């Protein structure tokens, strides 16, 4: 029904031969039957998957897909490192806000006799092993259990905040926390979100610029907030010459995402010294 309403918004389709289906409806197309299941907000309001029992095939709409350009058709043919990264990139930049819906949908998927999952875009998952792998991976990503790994994202004007970022990384690694350092100038916000898949902590740094944070950092954190990451720890730091608001702004932005902020923000006037 929602899909039909959307079509009416785009097209003059009242005279088209459209059959509206809902969860549990079955369509016979000769040798095969298509059983429909609504999966609202995964990741569109009108999302629906289709199951063909004769082929043990789930046509999964956007779920289990990837934005990947390849000449291969099946997931098991592709380099697995690149494939797993593509799965994380797609999930953490598109599906992440709908993780509760994912967790509700997975038991429905697991109740079906499936030998192949064909998403709307990306590689096809074939065979029991491949199907189990992607379903388990989706559950892990949707649960967002904290991981003992951190990411430090930063912008810098005259390298003072950059020096602080390197010091934060060194301190974390000295206590055994693997850390990824990412400049928002060098890494697109979608790359930063993909890395967040592996990290339980986000530490953000920016110099003060016009009494607030740098524009690229503001853009990155606004994008991150919209994707609603859960179960993360946050931290903030920054350098300044005069007013020094950036670290406080970062702290408040991370806290507004629901991140646990166990320590106060850290700010440095002018340039950091080793003794600091």
Sequence positions of predicted segments:
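Conserved beta-strand elements of the Class I
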Residues: 51, 58, 149-153, 235
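Short hydrophobic segments within beta-strands
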Residues: 60, 120, 153-155, 182, ...
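Catalytic core of the metallo-beta-lactamase
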Residues: 11-77
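Terminal amphipathic helices with adjacent charged low-complexity linkers/tails
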Residues: 122-149
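Short internal beta-strands
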Residues: 1-3
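Short, charged N-terminal beta->alpha structural module
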Residues: 153-175
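FMN-binding flavodoxin-like domain, especially the glycine-rich phosphate-binding loop
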Residues: 70, 80-117, 122-124, 167-180, ...
């Amino acid at each position: 029904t929602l899909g039909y309403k959307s079509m009416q918004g785009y097209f003059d389709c009242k005279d088209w031969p459209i059959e509206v289906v809902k969860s549990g409806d079955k369509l016979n197309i000769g040798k095969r039957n298509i059983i429909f299941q609504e999966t609202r907000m995964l990741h569109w309001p009108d999302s629906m998957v289709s199951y063909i029992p004769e082929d043990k095939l789930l046509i999964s709409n956007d779920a289990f897909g990837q934005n990947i350009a390849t000449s291969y058709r099946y997931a098991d043919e592709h380099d697995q490192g690149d494939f797993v990264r593509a799965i994380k990139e797609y999930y953490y930049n598109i599906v992440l806000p709908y993780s509760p819906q994912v967790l509700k949908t997975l038991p429905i998927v697991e109740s079906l006799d499936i030998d192949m999952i064909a998403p709307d875009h990306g590689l096809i998952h074939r065979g029991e092993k491949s199907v189990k792998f992607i379903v388990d991976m989706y559950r892990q990503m949707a649960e967002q259990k904290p991981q003992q790994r951190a990411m430090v994202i930063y912008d810098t004007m005259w390298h003072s905040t950059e020096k602080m970022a390197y010091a934060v990384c060194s301190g974390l690694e000295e206590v055994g926390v693997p850390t990824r350092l990412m400049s928002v100038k060098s890494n697109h916000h979608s790359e930063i979100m993909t890395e967040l898949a592996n990290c339980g902590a986000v530490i953000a740094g920016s110099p003060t610029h016009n009494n607030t944070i740098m524009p690229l950092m503001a853009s990155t954190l606004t994008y991150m907030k919209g994707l609603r990451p859960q179960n993360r720890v946050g931290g903030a730091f920054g350098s300044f010459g005069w007013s020094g608001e950036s670290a406080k702004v970062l702290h408040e932005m991370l806290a507004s995402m629901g991140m646990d902020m166990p320590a106060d923000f850290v700010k440095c006037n002018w340039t950091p010294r080793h003794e600091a």
